[in-house]
Amino acid sequence: SSLIGLNLDEACNTISKIPVNLKIFNKYTFDNRIVYVLNNKAENATTYNQSLLFVKRNTELKTLIIGWKEISRRYNFDDLSWLYDIEFELLNNNEIDKIVCIGPQAYDIATRLKYANIEEDKIVVIPLIEEATKFIKSKTKGNIYGILNFDMVEPFNNNMKGEKSGN
């Protein structure tokens, strides 16, 4: 019972039946590894920080892939200042096997990870998604977390599932 007359069990049951929006969050398995795909928005550190908190909450060994194709479709310049508002320091722990940086700014992401004191041997730069997913499938450990801008979600999923590839 509550002050406003809601039944807690009923409320929890109703909320648990809300379907997951697969455009924002997706989960499947690959080779006995759970693959989480978290859709983020470039230029928006808040979405990336929420994804990092989700990753941090799960304490198993994991591999991450982080990147995007385009920073902005609105502007003609590539402002990366927002990258330094992302709390990559949350990943500075023993639960990370590898962090694979992809896309045109893969080296910029790797540099930001180094500033977060992530061990350099955990940071891998592979700009092309097809090559990155091959590496993840064969040379990494743990569950897989894709922290990706919306423009990389479909190519990542397709390459992980062995469907039509794309970079």
Task: Label every model-predicted segment.
Residues 2-7, 13-167:
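ATP-dependent carboxylate-amine ligase
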